[in-house]
Amino acid sequence: MRVRVAVPATTANLGPGFDCLGAALTLYNHFWFAPASTGELEITARGMDAEKISGDRDNLVYRAFAAFFEKQEQPVPALKLEIELAVPLARGLGSSATAIVAGLVGANALAGSPWSNAQLCDLATELEGHPDNVVPALLGGCRLAARDRQNQWAIADLDWHPDFIPVVAIPDFELSTEAARQVLPTQYSRSDAIFNAAHVGLVVRSLASGNGEWLAAALQDRLHQPYRQALIPGYAAVETAALEAGAFGLVISGAGPTLLAISSPDRAEAVRQAMLTTWQATGLSVRAEILAIAESGTQIEQETEN
């Protein structure tokens, strides 16, 4: 049996929802899992940044795959893993989340699917360190994750109005999550905490209602974006261009450097072009795409090997 797993890219934070809010996007990495007839680990990769993918046990997909069986207290089976990449690495689009989710979902499928999505979410979050990418990557849609009184994850499925279109501009340079976290302060003021709490609430309400004026106000943040902007050359110019082209707002996607604008359907192409040409004018190689929310999350199917 061979299992194919398709995992969507994600955009985390959505401005003020730092480490708790994220949405799945219609850009996918694909993974194929099968028992290795050789009895040894076999990994092949193709597509975007494929040359950067580890071909041994350090591979993040394999590490998640192995973690599943270790939690089950079962031996890790020999694996034949094929990877096809469309989500660029270290760009703020949840590439590591696609790897972790794929590894867990593939392992669960080969084991006969003993785990629920809730169990997969818990281990994925443990491996990733935060839920804002792995949860929407697995479940789809826009998701808000928070701890309950027993320190378990409470995950809310949030409405995303069809009048809000995600537009991403992806520059050709990497920015690791670790580097993006190093620039953040260790403490915040009460006023900044209150500011973000209010704006997360407004993001949730505006996304559900389709109210663009609310969304334009809601996407502001004081916890991470002001500090990370300096790591992204051309940020201010691209933000200005997107707003002038009609975007409701622009935020850093995840840890960056990808920038996410949210637009009305009729302005999406103008926003895409404005972001693309403005960033290219700074000398960077950039691509820009109009995407949609991936409502169904990770997809899995069994295939017959040729």
From Swiss-Prot:
From the UniProt record, list the reaction(s) this protein catalyses: L-homoserine + ATP = O-phospho-L-homoserine + ADP + H(+)
Q: Which domain of life is it from?
A: Bacteria
Annotated binding of ATP, by residue: 88-98
Which SUPFAM superfamilies does the record cross-reference, listed alphabetically? GHMP Kinase, C-terminal domain (SSF55060), Ribosomal protein S5 domain 2-like (SSF54211)
One GO term of the cellular component aspect? Answer: cytoplasm
Q: Does the keyword Transport apply?
A: no
Q: Where in the cell is it found?
A: Cytoplasm
Q: What is its main location?
A: cytoplasm
What molecular functions are annotated in GO for this chain? ATP binding; homoserine kinase activity
User: Into which family does the record put it?
Assistant: Belongs to the GHMP kinase family. Homoserine kinase subfamily.
- Protein function: Catalyzes the ATP-dependent phosphorylation of L-homoserine to L-homoserine phosphate.
Its protein name is Homoserine kinase
